[in-house]
Amino acid sequence: MKLTVFGANGLTGRLLTQLALAEDHDVVAFTRRPDAFPIEHRRLEIAAGDVRDAAAVASAIDGTDAVLSALGVPFAKVPVSVYSDGVVNIIAGMHAAGIKRLACVSSSVMSPYPEPLGGFIFEKIMQPYVVSKLGRTVYDDMRRMEAIVSGSDLAWTIVRPSGLFEAPAVSAYGVAIDHIGHRFTARIDLADCLLRQALSDTCVRSAIAVATPGAKPSMLKLIWQEGIRKKP
């Protein structure tokens, strides 16, 4: 299978690219900074461009079998539109190329079924601050992205991880429709889940939660890594 990966130079995108190549898939890795992309492989094609450039996006999609979006941006005080603008161009490119399968990363924050998982400090102080203050503009745009994707005629899947952390290998992670009772997701599990969506139609036209049971990373480290530090 040939896959186009958007956000390929991010931490999740790199893992996704590596996993796909390890399974002998062909990958088109779309990135704004091709000079900084660290992966080389005979089955890899690097496509330079910005996801807000419709022509570049369409060119990267043409001739592939499925599209995976691992787009991500740090928290910002200013309005964010990368997710929504990007997915509009991705969907247009898929329509032009006659491609139907799309899986994209969102966040467990988007779930309409919140669960009490973190205790008083997490639920009453940390999470509300991150969602409504620190990450408000990012999550606002994720909501727009989800609405655009779910309103399309594509065979889409929205993948919602919980707090992301690093792990050395894919685990026996959990997947469920809409929500799952765990607070954290190993990034490599998220990448593997995205790849599985491209290879299956089990969760088509669904939002799924993916999480790593038993994980207990530092919440403050996660907030810094996912929302504050500059993305690669």
Give the positions of each predicted feature.
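Conserved beta-loop-beta element that borders a ligand/cofactor-binding pocket
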Residues: 146-167
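Glycine/proline-rich active-site loop of Rossmann-fold NAD(P)-dependent oxidoreductases
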Residues: 112-115, 168-171, 197-206
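Short, polar loop motifs at secondary-structure junctions
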Residues: 30-36, 161-164
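NAD(P)H-binding glycine-rich loop region in Rossmannoid oxidoreductase-like domains
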Residues: 4, 35-89, 93-96, 202
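Conserved beta-strand positions in the Rossmann-like core of class I SAM-dependent methyltransferases
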Residues: 4, 28, 157
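Conserved Rossmann-fold NAD(P)-dependent oxidoreductase catalytic core, especially the SDR/UDP-sugar
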Residues: 26-28, 34, 78, 88-146
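Mid/C-terminal beta-alpha module of Rossmann-like enzyme folds, strongest
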Residues: 2, 178-232
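N-terminal Rossmann NAD(P)H-binding glycine-rich loop of SDR-like oxidoreductase domains
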Residues: 3-23
